Every structure is written in C-alpha cells, then in structure tokens.
C-alpha cells in the first residue's frame, strides 16, 4: 500500500485503499492517500452481524490513525425488499447511516446504496448531498466508547454545522449544549430522527 501511495503521488493520483493494514499516519507523508478502510466497514453490518456498538468504538481506536472510508449511506436496511427469501436486516438504521457522515471522518465519502434507493428516500439522500466532507472545527459533545458518541462539526469555510449522534442497540436521550456556537446568532436546524420508539422498522425516520 505504501508503494502504491508513493507511485500515485508521483502522478498526482489520489488513493483510497480498502482491505489495507492498520493506518500509521502515512497519509500525512502522502497527502494523496486520502482515506483507507483498515477496519470492518458498512458491509459487515449486513453480512457478518457487526454489533451496533462497533461504530461507537471506532472514533477512539481506528480513527486515531487517520481518515476511514466506512462506505456509509445504506438506506434500505431490510433485505427482504430486494429478496423475499432473505429475512434478515442490517444491524443499523437509516438515520444512523446518515450520522456516520459526521461521526466517521473521511475527506472522501461514499453513497453506497443503489440509485433507486436514493430516489425512494430523496429527503434522506438530500442530507448526503448537503453534508460537508471537511471541517473547520470539531466538538465531541458526549461520548462513552462502546455505548454512544455525539459529534458537532463546522463545515470548512462555511457557517454551517452538522451534528451526528450514534448509539449501540440501546435507545437513549442525548443531553447536549450548544454553548460553543457564537452568541447572538439564530440557526435553522433540519433534524433527522429515528422512529424506533413508534415503529418497528429501522428504515422509518422523520426529517423536520
């Protein structure tokens, strides 16, 4: 992988490596090495029964070594929609997938679902189109590794903030403050919220 990054740098080609070994900070030496996987990503939430707490641990472990391409954006989480014989569902929710764009840093982000899925969930896909990929400021508002994490980030060069909060399999109420925001300003918020308390489907959500 290092050799590929070196040669790619000579030709001014960006690299996003998957199945790579653990990150060692060499993306600073080779800034064209934009991101890498180096941990279990979204596909394992479906095919390997990845536990929900996995992504609440990554910010304290894998992401210390550099940007991670987690390949988020799976909005159709129930497999029977595509194949009635498959009764399983991915260990995630639609809104949690959106939150990954904030909680799992990468300057190169994916929209990993099918185009027709994004047509069906157009308002959720709008968030993927709108969310920044680089940031001026980052605040960890609350966190407990293995349980939950809530992160607030300011879009680079813009007066736009994005907040992502994820949890394990247990629902919870986040207690956060916004005292880091400039005083005397008003903000308009678009909120994407799971309806896990009122609906059994992990794809149900509300955007307000």
What are these regions (language model features)?
Residues 1-91:
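Aromatic- and carboxylate-enriched substrate-binding clefts and catalytic-loop regions
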Residues 12-19, 42-47, 109-118, 137-139, ...:
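Acidic/polar loop patches that form or flank catalytic/metal-binding clefts of enzymes
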Residues 15, 103, 163:
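Conserved, mostly hydrophobic/aromatic
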Residues 100-136:
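Catalytic cores of secreted or luminal carbohydrate-active enzymes
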Residues 131-150:
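Edge strands and adjacent loops of beta-rich recognition modules
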Residues 145-183:
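Carbohydrate-binding surface patches
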Residues 181-193:
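Solvent-exposed beta-hairpin/edge-strand motifs
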Residues 197-202:
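Conserved small/polar residues in nucleotide/adenosyl-binding loops
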